[in-house]
Amino acid sequence: MVTVLTHATVFDGTRFLPGTRDVVIDGGRVTSVAEGGQGSHDAADDHIDCTGKTIIPGIIDCHVHLTSSGAAASSNFHDPFSLQFFQSVANMEATLKGGVTTVRDAGGTDLGAKMAVETGVVRGPRMTIAVNIMSQTGGHGDFHLVSGADSPFLAPHPGRPSGVADGLDGVQRTTRELLRAGADHIKICSTGGVLSPRDDPRHSQFTEAEIAVIVAEAAAQGASVMSHAQGAPGIKNAVRAGVRSIEHGIYLDEEAIDLMLERGTYLVPTLQAPQAVIKAAEAGAGLPPSVVEKARRVIEAHRESIARAHAAGVPIALGTDAGVGPHGENLEEISLLAEVGLTTAEALAAGTSVAARLLDDNQVGHLSEGGLADLVVVDGDLRTADVRGIESRVNAVYLEGELV
């Protein structure tokens, strides 16, 4: 069946096309982007009137945790170990229905989940995976607690090796183990974080030399490295060592911004993440007070940091850290990017064409003839309507031409 979405405003991943357009979908691909009313005159086709609506490429979220279902992880201590995998099926469905058709998982999802989506066992966004998070001992990704217990969050299993490593030999081996387990990219922590109760987001983790070994090992297998990096010293260590993207970037300084521009490093802000922690705490989640205090402390610095990076021209790709907050609300990040100074077109591009470049995937992130029919129909004309609130205006989502 040919589907024709008629008389819509179209954002193609880079710009708004003039006038209104008919988008014709056949066989999982966009076969035509014609002037409004000119897409198809075949009565057998399925014509859907999109007057007053905007069609954008399927959104790419460059930072999710599909096996995590919220910041309040204390229940994990009591849940069966396998529950996380069944919950991830619901998380993937919510992600799709929220308008996200491609994700870069930043730790937790293993090769089995990816294969389940690819083979049609479950429905979910297309994905690349990190498998687990690499961290130094005592770092942001080391979940051994001062109580002596190990948090079940990202606990190792046969498909998800531990990511904790130290020293040049140690990080080399762990990188290879994660790649062996099916990692498409490597996720590291080069600073402390908000959710780790006993470290500081401003403090560095892993040495620059350790990060360089990780980058080299990943590159040897055609993979890139994403770095959880919040404080400026750890951001700069990661950028100098050659990571592809900085995640969060809460305390960027001018030297860090200049380095990112020089090296072409992407920034994935995840503005939703600290807000999600605060919302969870206000809803009664049993989070450590130190975690909630850190989340409150970083929010304004985070916004200012991203605004300065954007003004300087650092490439910004959309990422949410979904799994800290709810899955399915990912497009709220577009609203938050607009609030820190990105134009509507820039905020949409962050989740489409810029994100596709970060992933080095030319099959997604654009709406054009011959491209995959990953599309989101949004209520309202985004050329003139405020993009903020887009997350509540998702009207329809298509994944390779199939209505989700």
Regions found by a protein language model. Name each.
Residues 53-119, 137-144, 209, 233, ...:
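Metal-associated gating/positioning segment near the N- to mid-region
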Residues 121-290:
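Metal-coordinating catalytic core of metallo-dependent amide/deamination hydrolases
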Residues 89, 96-97, 179, 239, ...:
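Non-catalytic positions within long, well-ordered alpha-helices that form the structural scaffold/packing
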Residues 8, 23, 28, 52, ...:
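Divalent metal-coordination and catalytic microenvironments
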Residues 1-42, 53-55, 381-385, 402-403:
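N-terminal metal-binding scaffold of metallo-dependent hydrolase/deaminase domains
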Residues 220, 285-381:
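His/Asp/Glu-enriched, well-ordered alpha-helical/loop segment
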Residues 8-11, 351-353, 357, 369-404:
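C-terminal cap of metal-dependent C-N hydrolases
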Residues 114-117, 211-220, 310, 338:
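Surface-exposed amphipathic alpha-helices with a cationic face
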